[in-house]
Every structure is written in C-alpha cells, then in structure tokens.
C-alpha cells in the first residue's frame, strides 16, 4: 500500500464529527489544536486529554452494542446521546485490545497465590474493567482484590457522578451504605474497602518519586523516614500489584513517564513485593503509516510524547527491564494478538458481526499498536503470582 493510500485515521468513525485522541479508546485520533507553550498551553493540553474520555466510552459502547464484547456497564458510563457506531476496524481494535488486557489481568488474578491482590489503573477515565471484574467474581473473591483508578480530577468527578446515578454500579462496587464509602465534598475522590478512585495528576507522583532515593532489594519497607507519605489513599505496598497503563503514559514526557513508573517500581513498592505492568500504546511512528498517523495528530495539537522513545516492541521490552521488572518482559502488536491469541472459532464469530472490507488497513492499523507486559516476582511466599504470564505468547523482534 502506497503512502497515498494510507487511510486518514481521523475519518475512521461513522457519523462524521470531529474526533479526539483518547488513549483508552486506542484507535481514535484528533483534537482541537492548542498552544503547548507555557502554563496556559499545558493546561489546555491537559483539557484535551481529559476531554477525550467520551470518545473512549463511545468506542467501547459501539463494540458492545454490535456484539464484540459483553459489558453491561458500557452504556451506564457513556454520556446519553453520545453513542456513535464506529467503523469495523475500530470495533475490532477495541475488541482485541480489551480482550488482550483482560487475559493478562485474569492470569494475574488466577495465579496460584492465595494472597489478596491489588490493581492500579493509570488514567482510568470511564474504564469499566473494575466493574466487570467485581461482577464476575464471587463475594469471597471480590474481597481478595483492591482496585485503584487514578486520573485527573475532572475525570474522577465525572465517574463518581455516574456511580451516584446508577444503582447497578453501586451494587457492583458493594456500596450498600454510607458506612463503607467515603466521598469528599469536592466529589472527585471515592474510597471503599475494595475500590479507590484518586484525583491525582500522575506528574505529581513523578515529581515525588524522582525526589527520593530508589530502594534497594534489601529495603524491607518503603515507609522509611525519608519516604514522603503516599498520596494514594488505600494503596497497600505489601500486596502483589498489577499496574495498567492503556495509552496513558504516552501523553507525558519521556522523563515524566519514566518517573511515574519508577515511583511505583523503585519507590513505593519494596523489591520483595511481586509487581507487574501492562502497557498499551501506539508504536512504529517512522514508517509511512506511522508518519501519517503522527501528522494527523500534530495538525490537531496532539503529541504522543513517548512515541519515539518507545517506538518498537524491543524498546517496550527494554523499558520494562529498565524499570526493574527483571523476571520477564514481552510485547506483541495488535495484529499478532489477533492472529495468535484469538481462537479460530472466536475469529469466525467476530467476522460474522459486521463486514470488514478494509483487511489491509486493519493490518496496518493493528501493527501500530501494541501490548507490553513485564513483571518482577519479588521474594517470599508470593513469587508465583505472575507465573501465568510465562505461558502467554509474546512477539519476537521489533
């Protein structure tokens, strides 16, 4: 396919309208152009990122309504009247990304360890994973999981409004009485025994993490005298923990993104605690398709700041190693995951949902997004928590 035939990613949506880029939506592009210089420019960029969550929820709802995914919470967390049916390659991309991360999460939770586990989702927005997980687990299993979501205050406040308005969400979270949930007057934070929603700018974690000394493998406890207090209420640094970044860190500068991950891997959690990280991000910006993708974003003031820093599968694997996740690292693009992780029967089911004529375009698009995962097994009784990840196929090469 020549460069002139590469589809403009801004048009990959039914119903027209101006698109936005949203990391959790994944296969979306576009946003108003803003000046990035100075504090006003930075604030404007933050608003662009915050405002893209609606597109993510619409893409998810589109995939659900057509039958790609089962998610009774998608409609509840999508603003009324914003539903738009996406094109088939967008729906398939949403399906593959969602099911791939779901598989990795399930292997973590189903690990041989019986210890309580913890998930921390960065830039979670309107993501439904916590609701899907809790609704699919027994009451006993639900009590063995603590789920944290971190995002800008504007997005956490919006999610809390949805929760307050939807009995389905309240029941799923087990928020049966005022005694087991705390929401401040600001309305942008929520804390309960199993679910915490944090209105925190990740860059503040990066700043606090870079200002402290990385702990050594012999450090028994991160709460040492020179350790600043953790700004994330309810996070337990002794539990086996999984971090999830669905195209979230890519909005930060390479230094900020690295400092955010290091805050968790080298400051907050001691080396003895099993810790894993799942990253979903675009890759390969330097071929013809990638350059077109980047150019489309640039015309709307969007810059995926770490894209060139972690431009390949090998760069993503190296990134995981550099963050101290030494026990294992793997990565695969979405096309590989579709071909290798999805069964033939499931491929046939998905193919029957709607006609996908743009096979070559699908392959191009899918090869420019990846899932990367890495972990450290820690020490002690829970070193097998991430053993299930060893059986999942990664992709070799770049």
From Swiss-Prot:
This protein's UniProt keywords: Methyltransferase, S-adenosyl-L-methionine, Transferase
E.C. number: 2.1.1.233
GO BP, sorted A to Z: methylation
UniProt xrefs under Pfam families: LCM
Residue spans of biased composition, Low complexity class: 208-218
Start-end of Polar residues biased regions: 1-11
Job of this protein: Methylates the carboxyl group of the C-terminal leucine residue of protein phosphatase 2A catalytic subunits to form alpha-leucine ester residues.
The protein's name in its UniProt record: Leucine carboxyl methyltransferase 1
Record gene name: ppm1
